[in-house]
């Protein structure tokens, strides 16, 4: 309707104010149908005062939300927590809200236009800042719970919950980082979500939030520990992306400040991630020294979680690259047992990867394939891009060893398509790259260059689910 007067570009720029743009409709229609604002306003007028109040307050949610979140964030000052369910049900009956099922349970959602109308009313009440703080506090609490429960049998539930809550977690992060006194909360929230950035395929987004968080100056007493955690998590993400220079800078700052403030946990994490950096840059003796020291520090302070187990897996990888396969197997079997005792599935997948590497190195491709299939299934369930692509890379080598060079080349094409969403392929590491080069050389020899390239291109065209199923 507006294209007679405006270009598509002008329409796009004006869509931020949908109520101003979408006005002046069919003059033969009822007055309440002629503009978007009066159409929504008609529904608003039909609501009771408590319904209008809840509508306005629910506008602070940036995506789907559950009942518990609505009760916490929106109650008080004229709306008791025990009344939220009844008022919310009335808004559902009037289609102000919609109800949806998700892997994280029953959720509620507002259409963006309905939400924008409520947000205008919330601003008019003068209560918007308080509601945004309550929204922030709820999601900081949710992230705290999810980080603790990641190391438990509820790992799948946690992954689904954070995925469903991501729009609201982003909104909470924005609020923390925009508020003058919210820097320490932003650093805390960005760091607490490490398992999602690293374990659920969100490396680039995690890097975005963490870099913003560590640039902010927080109150020393309130934010020191949160800043240290944000620094080592930022370094972890950058290492996995193959970006070693900013990773090293963050780790050096973290270690220096952790020692100054006598924070043994932050020292251990900084040392652990420095060992991980040495591993992916092929300095294996230094990696082994640092990782053993970090694991000793973890034991001294009683730390046991998925990060600690990953440190042991990384130590096993360093031992395997140096030729000590029995020690690598011992370390990863221990991790596997701890994971089974605690219901941990994510770190277990990386232990299976190292065990598969050892099985292939010892000439047992059948055992290696069995372990890698298990590893890949778990990584795919969590959407862990790094775990998935490492498993596919090694599966390609196992496949060529079993005599199917064409399928091995297809799998290399699959891996080639996956690496850009992670970072630098195989971290730029000669040791991690060795299986890829062995596979490529064997496949090219058996297929010829032209057929090899054709198979790689076929693999690169496969979607993620199709590739994993294959």
Q: Would you name each region that the model predicts?
A:
Residues 146-161, 382-385, 420-438:
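Acidic, Ser/Thr-rich low-complexity linear motifs
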């Amino acid at each position: 309707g507006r294209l007679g007067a405006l270009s598509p570009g002008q329409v796009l720029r004006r869509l931020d104010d949908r109520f101003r743009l979408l006005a002046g409709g069919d003059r033969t229609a009822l007055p309440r149908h002629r503009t978007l604002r009066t159409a929504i306003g008609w529904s608003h007028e039909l609501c009771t005062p408590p319904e209008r109040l809840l509508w306005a307050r629910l506008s602070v949610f940036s995506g789907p939300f559950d009942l518990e979140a609505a009760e916490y964030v929106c109650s008080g000052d004229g709306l008791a927590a025990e009344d939220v369910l009844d008022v919310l049900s009335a808004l559902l009956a009037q289609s102000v809200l919609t109800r949806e099922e998700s892997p994280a349970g029953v959720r509620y959602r507002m259409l963006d236009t309905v939400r924008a109308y409520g947000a205008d009313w919330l601003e008019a009440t003068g209560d918007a800042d308080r509601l945004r703080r309550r929204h922030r506090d709820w999601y900081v609490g949710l992230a705290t719970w999810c980080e603790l429960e990641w190391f438990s049998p509820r790992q799948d539930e946690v992954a689904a919950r954070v995925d469903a809550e991501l729009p609201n977690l982003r909104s909470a992060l924005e609020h923390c980082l925009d508020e003058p006194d919210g820097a320490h909360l932003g650093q805390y929230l960005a760091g607490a979500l490490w398992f999602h950035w690293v374990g659920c395929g969100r490396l680039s987004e995690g890097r975005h939030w963490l870099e913003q968080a560590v640039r902010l100056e927080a109150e020393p007493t309130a934010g020191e520990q949160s800043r240290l955690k944000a620094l080592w998590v930022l370094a972890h993400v950058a290492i996995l992306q193959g970006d070693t220079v900013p990773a090293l800078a963050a780790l050096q700052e973290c270690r220096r400040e952790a020692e100054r403030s006598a924070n043994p946990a932050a020292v251990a994490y900084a040392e652990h991630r420095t060992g991980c950096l040495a591993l992916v840059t092929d300095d294996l003796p230094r990696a082994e020294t640092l990782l053993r020291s970090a694991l000793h520090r973890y034991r001294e302070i009683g730390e046991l979680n998925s990060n600690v187990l990953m440190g042991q897996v990384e130590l096993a990888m360093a031992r395997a690259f140096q030729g000590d396969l029995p020690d690598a197997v011992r370390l990863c079997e221990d991790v596997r047992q701890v994971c089974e005792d605690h219901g941990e599935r994510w770190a277990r997948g990386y232990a299976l990867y190292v065990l598969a590497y050892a099985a292939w190195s010892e000439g047992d491709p059948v055992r290696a394939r069995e372990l890698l299939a298990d590893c890949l299934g778990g990584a795919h369930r969590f959407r862990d891009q790094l775990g998935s692509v490492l498993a596919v890379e090694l599966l390609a080598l196992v496949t060529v060893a079993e005599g199917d060079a064409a399928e091995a080349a297809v799998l290399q094409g699959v891996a080639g398509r996956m690496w850009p969403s992670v970072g630098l392929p195989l971290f730029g590491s000669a040791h991690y790259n060795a299986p890829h080069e062995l596979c490529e050389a064997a496949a090219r020899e058996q297929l010829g260059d032209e057929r090899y390239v054709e198979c790689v291109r076929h693999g690169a065209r496969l979607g993620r689910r199709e590739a994993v199923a294959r």
